[in-house]
Amino acid sequence: KIGMKVPGIIYINEEILKYMEGDSSFEQVANVATLPGIELASIAMPDIHWGYGFPIGGVAAFDIDYGVIVPGGIGYDINCGVRLINSNLRKEEVLKVRDKLSTELFNNIPVGVGTKGKIKLTEKNFKELICRGAEYMVDAGFGIKEDLNFIEENGRLKDASFEYVGAKAIERGLPEVGTLGAGNHFLEVQEVSEIYDEQLASKFKLREGYITILI
């Protein structure tokens, strides 16, 4: 595409390609490659699909002096990341109750666009949640203190401020506390089927044959 400053690199196989006919996400990869200060390449991972500006699954790095910051490039759920929860359950134990577990997860975790969470907060509580992060949820009984040791920044950004959170954002965010979301948001019950690095796995307390939950 005219104006591309770097190449586009897309990590997919033939099987994924079949499902992408008519999808404009390839064009979005090219569009990202035209942005000022982009470095090396406009990259897309295997979960690529159409987004707001960037494709979902898009990755781009920009020069700190000449690049751009695009908060709404993919969407508005900034800091949408992935968290792995370890467990002491073996695969055999979970398989016995697989159907029941699946039903309970769906019954207790609201999913989809426009769903409302079961955790009810006042605006004052919501403000505290935004400023204190996971620490607030632990104090509210939704986790244990040890959990915080395994979360980036201990689950709380020290400089977090409620000052610039507008009324519309509060209105949208309050009912969504405790929901999973939609699109490419997911919850998977997984098995550690193979260990590739014993030392690293030991640090994360990952054991072969045991169950983890990826959110």
Regions found by a protein language model. Give the residues of each.
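Secondary-structure transition/capping motifs at alpha-helix termini
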Residues: 64-65
